Amino acid sequence: MASQRSDFAPDLYDFIESNDFGEDPLIRAASAAEEGFTQPAAPDLLYGSQNMFGVDDAPLSTPAVVIPPPSPTPEPRGGKAKRSPSAAGSGGPPTPAAAAQPASPAPSPAPGLAAMLKMVHSSVAPGNGRRATGSSSPGGGDAADPVALDSDTETCPGSPQPEFPSSASPGGGSPAPRVRSISISSSSSSSSSMDEDDQADGAGASSSSSSSSDDSDSDEGGEEETPRPRHSQNAAKTPSAAGSPGPSSGGDRPAAGAATPKSCRSGAASPGAPAPAPASAPAPSRPGGGLLPPGARILEYLEGVREANLAKTLERPEPPAGMASPPGRSPHRLPKDQRPKSALAGASKRKRANPRPIPQTQTQAPAEEAPQTAVWDLLDMNSSQATGAAAAAASAPAAASCAPGVYQREPLLTPSGDPWPGSDPPPMGRVRYGGTGDSRDGLWDDPEIVLAASRYAEAQAPVPVFVPEMGDSTKQYNALVRMVFESREAMSWLQNSKLSGQDQNLAQFCQKFIHAPRGHGSFITGSVANPLPHIGDAMAAGNALWALPHAAASVAMSRRYDRTQKSFILQSLRRAYADMAYPRDEAGRPDSLAAVAGYPAQAAAAAASQQQPEAPAPSVRVREAYTRVCAALGPRRKAAAAAAAPGTRAPRPSAFRLRELGDACVLACQAVFEALLRLRGGASAVPGLDPSEIPSPACPPEALCSNPAGLETAALSLYELRDLVERARLLGDSDPTHRLGSDELRLAVRAVLVVARTVAPLVRYNAEGARARASAWTVTQAVFSIPSLVGGMLGEAVSLLAPPTRSQQPSSSSPGGEPFSGSAAAEGSLQTLPPLWPTVPGKQSATVPSSHSQSPQHSQSGGGAGATTATCCRATQTNARSRGQQHQPQKARSPQAAASPAHLSQEAMPGSSSDDRAIHGRPRGKSGKRRSEPLEPAAQAGASASFSSSARGYDPSGPVDSPPAPKRRVATPGHQAPRALGPMPAEGPDRRGGFRRVPRGDCHTPRPSDAACAAYCPPELVAELIDNQLFPEAWRPALTFDPQALATIAARCSGPPARDGARFGELAASGPLRRRAAWMHQIPDPEDVKVVVLYSPLQDEDLLGGLPASRPGGSRREPLWSDLKGGLSALLAALGNRILTKRSHAWAGNWTGAPDVSALNAQGVLLLSTGDLAFTGCVEYLCLRLGSARRKLLVLDAVSTEDWPQDGPAISQYHIYMRAALTPRVACAVRWPRERHLSRAVLTSSTLFGPGLFARAEAAFARLYPDSAPLRLCRSSNVAYTVDTRAGERTRVPLAPREYRQRVLPDYDGCKDMRAQAEGLGFHDPDFEEGAAQSHRAANRWGLGAWLRPVYLACGRRGAGAVEPSELLIPELLSEFCRVALLEPDAEAEPLVLPITEAPRRRAPRVDWEPGFGSRSTSVLHMGATELCLPEPDDELEIDGAGDVELVVEHPGPSPGVAQALRRAPIKIEVVSDDEDGGDWCNPYLS
């Protein structure tokens, strides 16, 4: 009954009585009024905040304002609501406009509603106001309950009013205005007795004539109902419910608490309420059993109509999509005209579940109770996501009936079945941040956030930094879940994701404006890493899968687990969440529809698979192809070896088949790349072609020798990827099912990269040979030839490119030239792959006869499997420098071989190409024989030596060189030089012989091949080869550890025999051989060696130095400068604590003599190059000698992976081995030439050859040799250079000041030409030129050529690969420190290492000149520009003027005048091979 005001009531009654309206028109009018009700006005915040009142002055029959409850404690089922004593008389304050009037006494009740309405009309006062009251109790009434029913009780003036407390009324003398009671029920009230309560309520008695006190009493009485008392004088003696005597109520009107329904729960007792009757007492409709008055009947009909409309509303479908509020926004925060009308507003939970039927009409069956999963969604009106989940849960039975296999996702709730606390969206203008329910101000308008939101909208992968202002977190969560399941380095990315420049700026912005103002580092933020959204989004959505990235990131952040343990936890999380992320149906198949309905992370692939159930989607096929590639090339299990019979060896594939498969993989990679470029229109648009995403090989090169099937599977998978990419290009525009997204293309690129990096050693890191064997390229090369040859070459190409048919040649040879044998047939054919053609036009195809044993590359002669192993291992080496040392078939010298023209050409090798000359050999001289190549077996057929190839089945195709035929041999008649190397004797090697001594157990470096270990030189030949004054006697045993070195020495014995009975000629000690043997003169005694530094020199770099050929008398070629690869120059610069640039003295191109490393040798440091003679033997000899003496050798390896020699030294894990990268790019002047402020800074870390590595080595050295002098690896005194200065063409720098004065000053003694004297002494030259002292005053102070020391910045492993200076995030104070710092030359000073993440805690060191020595500023010339460095004044402490820096420190640092080096913090030593001293249990050198 809308708008029931006091002045309107008599008019309404008179209108009804005068027109004699029936019941039906009134019902229709009430129904229309019910369906067209309006929205409530805004709540009274003043009264509502007191938790005492509900809605103030709200019209009747309107829903209450929904306010979320503060999660009240659940009431025990069936328990009674507890009532607060203070709430018994709670009331509402009067309106401010109400006039002050004394309370009037309550008259007797009127006999009926009509009389009551007339009495209201006759006794209304003009000053009377009205008031909305509501009671609040812990158990029953809560003013903030979102599900409240308007229980409107209209009373007349003068009726019994509750006595309000003094705190309830603003004014003390205000009269009690007219009461309008609105009871609010708590969501935590008991629902177990709902049906019983409804039955006890009878036929829907109206609540308009009942007071809140009877509601409370009836609520406590279970099924009790208060009967209407008879109209007698005894009614005046009924005590009040509060226990206090109240005014008697006379007359024959019903009491103020008659027939109160349970839905009116206020928890307040009003005076004058009669005591509740027993539950069994009937409730007559009228005292005395008569009919109700006409007014009461009308009210009952209206109440029934209202409840019937509520029942219809519950059966209506969900509102249209347009009425729903947008995600993350409450509908009650919308403007009033845009708020959706809630059909359930104003109804209690009992009425929602069980609507009442219309009384005295057709009885309707009560609606079935709503599902339990949807109850919390109806209560949580502010969560649109929860409402959507509830709607899905409510429609679960219907969906299950039509699709029984559909996976039903249930939201994750609390154990009590309630939504998680804090699930409500944050208030307007705020976003989630911090603990449960906390939020912060939104920063949507900040430029950094705007740019980040645009990047997030376009990103396909998870963004490395996420903030709530960027948009909906669903996309980020799904991408993170995908990444956790698919990425190999998921935890590393979550903890330390690589940030670009923009993401780095965003991360700094978040740290400065979001995290820093809100607490310390352990402050609760709701997400443990930058990429993770707030956990509140997952809690609000009830999505358990979204907790997976949080769990993975939490484990990744923990320091309590190592890498292996974290990997186990990650795998456990993947298995635990697998069924949730990839649901399966009852048959165990992946249920794509369930993935769509449950978790949208797999929605795209599932939708495609549903559209094409007969064939997997392209994205699925891409993933399967990538999986097959990884499985085919991954580490092979030992099951095949275990299945073989005992005592038998598994058959190994031939070298020809391995080359065929390697070329097939190269062509497959090329085909995929071409398809990708055509699809995306360029390489820059292809995802995954990033240097940072290059994967590591799937298996070591040696594993490919026994896995030909894996190579074939990988090639076939790549061709399948090529087909998928082509379909996407041709059909993707018209058919969306063939399209490939960025994730699929990235996976395809990664599959190609995995194959390429794994197969690269097999093709010797060169794809030209495979390209020449492509059929289309062969024909193209033929048609583009010159006119005179185009016809013949095209015909030859067509004949050569005939389809290969192995079945036609069962006993002869294959199209590639390899004999077809049973083993080849067992290996399988390549008919499923595109054909590989043997050669290019213009070359004769090889036709090798059955006597193919003449070719050592493709046969198994005598040695059997050993020869095949040697060939296989040779084909899979990773050293590009040793390509020229590979053994290739050469021109046969026997008459039988010369009779066949095919044997005289290079094409005797199957599958050879025009590129083979560049790969396998060098241009030959007139004799047609390279000096470093061994003799062929045919040339030794008539030899009478004891090591002939036919004697013991020796295969000369081993990885070591035999003595080649000299160009000029002065040989006596009948003399034939023996072969230096032969097979290993059956009885075992002699201890004085030459062979490899490979230690037992595990090694830091790859173990040599079986063929290298099988090479042997007899002791009598060893003694003759090493007996030369070129080799110091103490180091001669090292030569016996290296058969390769012995073969090289034998190849240089080209002179006449040194004495009678000698088997070899006299050794010709040429310049290159002397340079390769110079290392033996560094340390005379091998016992004094404690540290070995391994490096790979650049071209023409060696320790002998010498004048370059550009100078008069020079014979040495000028070395090549490289900005990327470091050689001997970079090694000495790091050991000498100086910066390497192309113009500095440290570069080998500026040397005029040999560098002096005697200071390092005095400490026991041996510098060993991969090009030195017996490099492998020296390392293994030192390891064996020191290990036998129970000493550990400290090995520092600066050799890159691609430069590691073939069959390099095996270093046992008993010794200490440290590896680091050597590159000139550590100097900021080389890496970023334009950054002038960093020209004297050098980057360092534990992975770079520099102070970071040296600190680890010095600590290990101190543990190994506690009684020795400490190791000093980064000192200026370690290295001295021989360069051209004004003191001479070959001046050793730094030249001491005393020696400088002795050599330079006498030339100008008595010179009258002051200009010549100034120019000769360099008075006006810069003090330092390219870091070295140049002017006279600088040379007179520190020495000529003394260099400035750099400032080392500890950048960590990630900073070592920085491309731009901004990626290092250098603090401004540190950058200024590097600009003004000038570390004067000091031969014994330690390196100055500063952390790159902190501001320096000391003043920048300067150079100060005493008066009388010229200008106080120091001039430094670098890269053609001169810089003036001002000294540090003594009178100013903080700011010294231009060029200085203001330092802000917490603790006072050293005094400005003290030039002392910063003490470096202790660096953690992370050496895998470190062991306790004196432990011999793992020493492989002790028998």
Swiss-Prot record:
Start and end residues of each stretch annotated as Disordered: 41-295, 310-370, 803-1007
Residue ranges with Basic and acidic residues bias: 988-1007
Segments of skewed composition (Basic residues): 920-929
Pfam families in alphabetical order: Herpes_ICP4_C, Herpes_ICP4_N
Biased composition (Acidic residues): 214-224
Biased composition (Pro residues): 66-75, 273-285
GO cellular component: a single term: host cell nucleus
InterPro entries linked: Herpes_ICP4_C (IPR005205), Herpes_ICP4_N (IPR005206)
Compartment(s) of residence: Host nucleus
GO biological process: DNA-templated viral transcription; positive regulation of DNA-templated transcription
Biased composition (Polar residues): 878-893
Processing after translation: A long stretch of serine residues may be a major site of phosphorylation.
UniProtKB keywords: DNA-binding, Early protein, Host nucleus, Phosphoprotein, Transcription, Transcription regulation
Bias (Low complexity): 165-193, 201-213, 235-272, 807-829, 849-860, 867-877, 938-951
GO molecular function, a single term: DNA binding
Lineage top rank: taxon: Viruses
Function: This IE protein is a multifunctional protein capable of migrating to the nucleus, binding to DNA, trans-activating other viral genes, and autoregulating its own synthesis.
Entries under PANTHER family matching the protein: LP07818P1, OS12G0136300 PROTEIN
Family: Belongs to the herpesviridae ICP4 family.
Name of protein: Major viral transcription factor
Gene that encodes it: IE
